[in-house]
Amino acid sequence: METLFDKFKIPDYFTIGGQEYKVVQKEVVRDENDDPVFGLHSPAEATITIAHKFPITDSSKHNFTKDQIVNSFFHEMFHSFNFMMNNEQEEVIAQSFANFMCEFLKTARYDSEYEGRESSRPFDQEY
């Protein structure tokens, strides 16, 4: 059975607390120290940048799975939520919520009366 996770697509833009964010997906993402990272949240630039690969050596890169890429997006998105609430960047909160969100999208089920409804996006169904 196809899940919400299977249907989920990372957006190019979204708005949180009145601030529009741009989402950039790149092969490799590096932080301010030039270290490779899974993703970055920049409240000053209102951007989230997500990596698709992680350098192992100078000539070898690990390809992230969809699970890793989507989890990284949610992790950085939850940084934007937390920043809007209290101007902090708590890693443990962002990662916990990202894990919960991915689990939710993978396990959400619908009663049989809603099965078979077609939608291009999982959240725009009419009831």
Regions found by a protein language model. Give the residues of each.
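Metalloprotease/metallohydrolase-associated module, dominated by Zn2+-dependent proteases
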Residues: 1-67, 84-127
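Active-site recognition of the HExxH zinc-binding catalytic motif
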Residues: 71-83
